[in-house]
Structures are given as structure tokens and as C-alpha cells.
């Protein structure tokens, strides 16, 4: 009895060590790169302002109700708590997502282990997940976007769904209802896209008739509707145009690309299939055909296999029918990882020799992908074409450059395809140093202006019209300059890094 207990302790200790090692790509040097464009940049400003105003219902941008990103503020609440603990830093914005991603790994492991009673199968699912760029890359596990929390909530919902299918206790209906409420407060209707696959799984597992005849399903549904409606009506009280913004920014018009607020270029229905194969799932996608072949060999679709297959494929098809961004398919990564892991388990149950033969290439791919993920985390850097997007952010992130800024400093960007990923840093400087820096245009320039820019086109244009004195410089074309008349003589000596 004692030896069995000691063996179990050692096995779980091994699992814990492996999980810590697998989590490294999710948190190593997570604060080195500046705040990223789009959702993270928007969320960072929302969180900074909420930490000041304590307006917990309405997300604001420049202290006005945010209508560009009208998602509820669950993630922002966590980021505000993180700011209170860690200050206005990149780590504060990203730490909640890192925690959610690590928790997702444990939920995924727990779900697969519950299905198989095999720890190594659960570890394979986690290995596939954390080494996929679609999980640890930008807009996902390491960054302050909504995807990390959404993935955790989807996995939590699926865990409760599976437990309910095995043991239809009413508490699981309320757990699933609570998760849906949190999911809506995280990223609007995104979590509801998992429901069609869940219904199909319950039908296949013959749990559907009992579900619809259970009054607690309707009580749980009512709970969801009341809590979600309470938030949306409460926010509408303070932001009267909020429901209009939600309709066009989050619901059907956005999905069908008929929104009056957002417009997306047309992308093929097969876009996500290509992205999974070429970018986010990469080598692991080679194993996906085997997940279809294995149940064919067994001449049986097990409930466990069908659980992952139907939830993953249904979500993929729904997402493929709507507007698209690379990071929208981040929740697909753990679902397909679970599908591959369960397929290996099914093969193991049929033939241990075949399963261990397949295990060898999995370990080879796993080592290769882990090395890539670990390297990306250990040496985070900008791509060559990103310096003209994040140059100002790097400049403002580094305290060594801040002493050269003044109330006369203005930011000048090119007149086309220019983004303001640096707004979080401007607000941080304003709060900490009382220094307000605004953006200007070419038409507003005056002799004596101090200009901060990161576009080569801007620097070249300034040199044509002014004598440009470089006070400070950073990566590539990021320069802090003073404009002088062409007739003036300056000492042009950049302080290059």
C-alpha cells in the first residue's frame, strides 16, 4: 500500500515538473516587447483609465466610452487588479493572460486525464498546445488580449459538459451557465459558438433527451439571461448608444461583414484551415489526418473522440463562415490537441505497439516545436517590418530616453497606414511625470518643434523642409528631433544605441 502511494506521489511530482517546463514559453521574458497593436493596446488604455476613474461598467478610451471595442470588461477588471499590484507595466497588462493560459493547460490536462486515466496522454495534449504558435504567440497566451481568458472559459465549459455527460448532475448545468456568463463578459458571444458542437456531442452520447426534460436547464438558462442582461442594461444606462455599438461591433453585422462600424476585407472560407496548417499548428497538423484514420481502423467513433472532433470542427466551421483575424482561431489549438491526444489513446487501447511507434514522431515534433517556442520566448524581438510600428513604443518604454522629452514634444506619423500602439506609454508618462505629448501633422509643424517619429518617410520629409537636429535616436528610424530653419546651423549629433 505504501509503495503504491509513493509511486503515485512520484508520478504526480513528475507531472508537475513537466507542466512547469511546458509553461516556460508562456511566461519567459513576457514583458520585454512593448504593448502590441490592436486589442492589447486598446485593453491597456482601457485598464489604465479604469484604474484611475474606477468606472467598472464602461470601458473608456481617452476617458470617453469606447465604441471601437465594446466588449464587456471582465478581462479589464483583472488587468486593473494587476496594475494595482504591479504598477503601469507590460507585466501588469499581460500577467492575467499568462495565468489564464497556464490554468488552461491544467484544465486541458485534467479533462484528458478524466477521459483516459492516463497522465501521459494528458501531457501530450498540453505539449501540443503550448508548442503551437497559435496558443503562445501574439494575441494569445502571452499577451493582454481576450483570447487567453476565452480559451480558459471554453475549456472549463467543455470540462463541465463532459462531466455532465458521464454523470448528469444538476450542478454541472449551473457551472456551465456560470462559465457562459463569464465568457460573455469576456468576449461577448464568442463563447456561444461552442454550443452547437456541445449539443451534437450530447446527442451522440444520448444525453440530450434527459437534458431538455430537466427543469434545471431552464433555471440555468434564466440565470444566464438575467446576469448578462443586467450588465448590458446597466452599461446602456451610462452609455446610451452601447447596444447599437454592440450590434454592429460584436453581433451579426460584424460576423457577416455588414457592420456600419467595422469593415473587413474578404478572406476565403478556407483561410483558417491554411493558417492552422502553415502558421499556428504547423507540424502538429501532420497528425490531424491520423485522427480521422484511427477511428476508421477501429470501425468505431468513441464518445471521447467524438467529443473533441465535433467541438473542434464545429467551432472551426462557424468561425470560417464569418469575418476573420489570425487570432480568432486560438481556441482551436487545445481542441485539436485534445483530439490528437485522444486518438493516440484510442490507438493505444487497440495496439500498444502501434501507439508507441506513433509516440516516437510525436516526441520528435514536440522537441522541435518546444525548442522553437522556448527560443521565441527567450529572445523576443520585432520582425524587420515592425520597427516602424513599435519604434516609438520602444523609445517611450526605455527610461533612458525620457529625459529628452519636453512639453514641446509632438509625435508625427506618416499620413497613411499609421497606428498608435504607443498610447499606453503616453498615458503612463502623463500620469507619472505630468508630461502630455500630443500627435501633430505636417501642416501644423513650426520652427522649434520637437518631433518624435519612427517612420523613415517622415524623417526624409522633414529633412527636405527643415534643418533637423537629432536629440536622441533609437531603433532604426525612431528619432527625437528639433526643427530649425534651413538657414540655421545646428550641431547634428545623434545618440545612437
Show where each model-derived region lies.
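Transmembrane-helix signature of polytopic, membrane-embedded enzymes
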Residues: 12-17, 108-131
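Extracytosolic helix-loop segments that constitute the early lumenal/periplasmic catalytic or substrate-binding loops
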Residues: 24-29, 43-67, 74-77, 81, ...
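Transmembrane-lumen/periplasm boundary regions of multi-pass, lipid-linked membrane glycan transferases
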Residues: 43-50, 182, 191-300, 312-322
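Transmembrane-helix motifs of polytopic, lipid-linked glycan transferases
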Residues: 95-116, 156
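Membrane-interface transmembrane helices that cradle and orient dolichyl/undecaprenyl
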Residues: 114-116, 155-173, 297, 344-347
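Short hydrophobic alpha-helices at membrane interfaces in multi-pass membrane enzymes
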Residues: 120, 160-181, 309-312
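Hydrophobic/aromatic-rich transmembrane helices and adjacent perimembrane loops
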Residues: 323-349
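Short periplasmic/luminal acceptor-recognition loop of GT-C membrane glycosyltransferases, typified by
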Residues: 368, 372-488, 493
Amino acid at each position: 500500500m505504501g509503495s503504491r502511494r509513493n509511486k503515485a506521489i512520484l508520478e504526480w511530482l513528475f507531472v508537475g515538473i513537466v507542466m512547469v517546463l511546458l509553461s516556460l514559453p508562456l511566461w519567459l521574458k513576457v514583458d520585454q516587447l512593448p504593448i502590441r497593436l490592436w486589442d492589447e493596446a486598446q485593453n491597456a488604455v482601457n485598464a489604465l483609465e479604469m484604474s484611475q476613474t474606477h468606472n467598472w461598467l464602461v470601458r473608456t478610451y481617452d476617458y470617453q466610452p469606447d465604441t471601437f471595442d465594446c466588449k464587456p470588461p471582465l478581462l479589464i477588471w483583472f488587468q486593473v487588479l494587476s496594475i494595482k499590484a504591479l504598477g503601469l507595466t507590460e507585466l501588469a497588462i499581460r500577467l492575467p493572460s499568462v495565468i489564464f493560459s497556464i490554468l488552461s493547460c491544467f484544465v486541458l490536462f485534467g479533462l484528458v486525464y478524466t477521459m483516459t486515466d492516463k497522465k501521459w496522454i494528458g501531457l501530450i495534449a498540453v505539449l501540443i498546445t503550448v508548442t503551437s504558435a497559435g496558443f503562445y504567440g501574439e494575441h494569445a497566451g502571452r499577451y493582454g488580449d481576450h483570447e487567453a481568458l476565452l480559451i480558459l472559459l471554453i475549456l472549463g465549459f467543455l470540462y463541465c459538459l463532459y462531466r455532465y455527460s458521464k454523470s448528469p448532475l444538476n450542478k454541472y448545468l449551473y457551472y456551465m451557465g456560470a462559465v457562459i456568463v463569464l465568457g460573455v463578459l469576456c468576449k461577448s458571444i464568442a463563447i456561444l459558438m461552442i454550443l452547437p458542437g456541445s449539443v451534437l456531442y450530447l446527442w451522440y452520447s444520448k444525453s440530450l433527451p434527459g437534458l431538455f426534460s430537466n427543469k434545471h436547464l431552464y433555471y440555468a438558462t434564466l440565470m444566464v439571461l438575467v446576469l448578462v442582461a443586467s450588465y448590458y442594461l446597466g452599461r446602456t444606462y451610462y452609455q446610451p448608444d452601447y447596444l447599437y455599438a454592440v450590434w454592429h461591433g460584436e453581433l451579426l453585422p460584424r460576423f457577416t461583414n455588414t457592420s456600419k462600424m467595422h469593415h473587413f476585407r474578404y478572406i476565403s472560407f478556407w483561410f483558417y484551415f491554411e493558417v492552422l496548417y502553415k502558421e499556428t499548428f504547423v507540424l502538429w497538423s501532420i497528425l490531424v489526418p491520423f485522427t480521422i484514420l484511427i477511428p476508421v481502423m477501429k470501425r468505431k467513433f468513441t464518445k471521447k473522440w467524438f467529443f473533441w472532433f465535433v467541438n473542434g470542427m464545429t467551432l472551426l466551421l462557424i468561425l470560417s463562415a464569418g469575418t476573420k483575424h489570425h487570432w480568432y482561431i486560438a481556441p482551436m489549438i487545445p481542441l485539436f490537441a485534445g483530439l490528437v491526444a485522444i486518438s493516440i489513446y484510442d490507438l493505444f487501447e487497440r495496439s500498444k505497439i502501434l501507439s508507441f511507434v506513433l509516440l516516437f514522431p510525436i516526441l520528435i515534433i514536440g522537441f522541435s516545436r518546444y525548442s522553437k517556442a522556448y527560443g521565441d520566448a527567450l529572445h523576443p524581438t520585432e520582425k524587420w517590418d515592425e520597427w516602424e510600428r513599435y519604434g516609438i513604443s520602444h523609445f517611450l518604454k526605455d527610461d533612458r530616453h525620457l529625459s529628452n522629452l519636453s512639453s514641446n514634444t509632438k509625435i508625427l506619423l506618416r499620413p497613411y497606414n499609421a497606428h498608435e500602439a504607443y498610447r499606453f506609454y503616453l498615458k503612463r508618462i502623463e500620469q507619472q511625470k505630468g508630461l502630455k505629448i500630443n500627435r501633430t501633422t505636417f501642416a501644423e509643424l513650426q520652427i522649434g518643434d520637437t518631433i518624435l517619429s519612427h517612420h523613415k518617410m517622415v524623417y526624409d520629409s522633414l529633412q527636405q523642409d527643415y534643418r533637423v537636429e537629432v536629440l536622441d535616436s533609437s531603433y532604426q528610424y525612431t528619432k527625437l528631433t528639433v526643427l530649425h530653419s534651413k538657414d540655421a546651423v545646428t550641431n547634428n549629433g545623434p545618440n545612437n544605441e
